[in-house]
Amino acid sequence: MKQSKVFIPTMRDVPSEAEAQSHRLLLKSGLIKQSTSGIYSYLPLATRVLNNITAIVRQEMERIDSVEILMPALQQAELWEESGRWGAYGPELMRLQDRHGRQFALGPTHEELVTSIVRNELKSYKQLPMTLFQIQSKFRDEKRPRFGLLRGREFIMKDAYSFHADEASLDQTYQDMYQAYSRIFERVGINARPVVADSGAIGGSHTHEFMALSAIGEDTIVYSKESDYAANIEKAEVVYEPNHKHTTVQPLEKIETPNVKTAQELADFLGRPVDEIVKTMIFKVDGEYIMVLVRGHHEINDIKLKSYFGTDNIELATQDEIVNLVGANPGSLGPVIDKEIKIYADNFVQDLNNLVVGANEDGYHLINVNVGRDFNVDEYGDFRFILEGEKLSDGSGAAHFAEGIEVGQVFKLGTKYSESMNATFLDNQGKAQSLIMGCYGIGISRTLSAIVEQNHDDNGIVWPKSVTPFDLHLISINPKKDDQRELADALYAEFNTKFDVLYDDRQERAGVKFNDADLIGLPLRIVVGKRASEGIVEVKERLTGDSEEVHIDDLMTVITNKYDNLK
């Protein structure tokens, strides 16, 4: 394709709000253009890359007998009300109503709709298992869209849904999808690591995320250097081994602590280590207030709280609620209280005596507080985030941290949707059973961004061969010179039969062409310049920067060999 005919609006300067390198490069290289916050148009080069990604996805889906369909983005509210998610999903769900006052959502996922499609069709165990997938735009009203395609309000996704008669069948499809996702990310050129994760608003009993390692990633991965253990930090278990500090129990004392708000400020004020301070936070669990205690250097993990209490209906109490309940602001809370409120403490709190806690009075704290004498703990548990260097639950050694971008996730949904939506089949005994489900998503547009995030240098994008928008970049330095133009035209005609060629035939300065070529990042470059009359051209590899002069008689062989050896 001739570059003069392709819409590639490269930029010299990018908006300052483009923080992620992938966002900057996708804008700068003319692959995407922002329409409004979190919404982008995919221009010709990006569209070609997306087509290459989706081709790989389709191949791997078909390999495991997943069948493609296409569902509407617009979903009626009644389906979401059946599952209970219409009220539970929150403000991220884009809601609208038609001229008749009927409520709809622009789908972020399609569990409800796909369940409604199959519930009256998959009637017998003989029709199972069945896996359906689609590639489609999704919508989520992000509070703060950022990082370009990594967190947008409209995005392209491959979502698949499987239906089963028993757990063994679900396990097999889950494993098939897990392996298919691993192959997909390897093929598109992403270093992605599967990690144990939380299922969030989608629900389900078991899930893995596929995380593309990147410094810009918004998720923290906990992993082992000695085993294949990897988990999202929200799910990483903290191993508790008792380490009691045997100090003499001291009398309870109330002290004034003016202008002290945080655990670190309190530790500094008292001249004590922050891990001897105990923080108290108040949550509402299904409408009931509880206190949760952790040591001063630890942070409460609300995902673990949801898992522990078996409900998503958990939220941090507001400042007004806290003041009304205990008469003090959040920085002064403590478990020594004359109100009926259940107290839960992280396992590591029980290692301490003579605790320092809030006095439930602004500007005051209690020291030498002891469990059993001054207050009681209803239950201990793992309620906090793991720290780097702590022991991992698989016994392999210390926890290490890395940042990652979630590019895919697989879920075992069980009967969460089929039960609420009455999707049943007859088993081999003729009894009605709820369909057992799995769901599996890949962020296609996010994968595009993750590829760029992991495959670039200071000059621009470096496309992996499998997804590159074109294989070769043919550049005529000066098309006004007959020998250069004629040779470039001839090479374009020859190589276009075997490769996808982008032919830069523009009337631009050489520097502009080379800068654009580096930005766009095609794997191989053929430059027709001042030695065209001798039949000599330059061949350059984008990844290594290696270049050599080649006679046109040898050019096809050289290019074919180099291309075959590309990754």
From Swiss-Prot:
It catalyses: tRNA(Pro) + L-proline + ATP = L-prolyl-tRNA(Pro) + AMP + diphosphate. It is an enzyme of class 6 (ligase). InterPro entries: aa-tRNA-synt_IIb, aa-tRNA-synth_II, aa-tRNA-synth_II/BPL/LPL, Anticodon-bd, Anticodon-bd_dom_sf, Pro-tRNA-ligase_IIa, Pro-tRNA-synth_IIa_bac-type, Pro-tRNA-Synthase_IIa_type1. GO terms for cellular component: cytosol. GO terms for molecular function: aminoacyl-tRNA deacylase activity; ATP binding; catalytic activity, acting on a protein; proline-tRNA ligase activity; transferase activity. Homodimer. SUPFAM superfamilies: Class II aaRS ABD-related (SSF52954), Class II aaRS and biotin synthetases (SSF55681), YbaK/ProRS associated domain (SSF55826). It is found in: Cytoplasm. Belongs to the class-II aminoacyl-tRNA synthetase family. ProS type 1 subfamily. PANTHER family: MITOCHONDRIAL RIBOSOME PROTEIN L39/PROLYL-TRNA LIGASE FAMILY MEMBER (PTHR42753), PROLINE--TRNA LIGASE (PTHR42753:SF2). Consists of three domains: the N-terminal catalytic domain, the editing domain and the C-terminal anticodon-binding domain. Gene3D superfamilies: Anticodon-binding domain, Bira Bifunctional Protein, Domain 2, YbaK/aminoacyl-tRNA synthetase-associated domain. It comes from the Bacteria. Catalyzes the attachment of proline to tRNA(Pro) in a two-step reaction: proline is first activated by ATP to form Pro-AMP and then transferred to the acceptor end of tRNA(Pro). As ProRS can inadvertently accommodate and process non-cognate amino acids such as alanine and cysteine, to avoid such errors it has two additional distinct editing activities against alanine. One activity is designated as 'pretransfer' editing and involves the tRNA(Pro)-independent hydrolysis of activated Ala-AMP. GO terms for biological process: prolyl-tRNA aminoacylation. Pfam families: HGTP_anticodon, tRNA-synt_2b, tRNA_edit. Keywords: Aminoacyl-tRNA synthetase, ATP-binding, Cytoplasm, Ligase, Nucleotide-binding, Protein biosynthesis. Its EC number is 6.1.1.15. This is Proline--tRNA ligase. It comes from Staphylococcus aureus (strain COL).
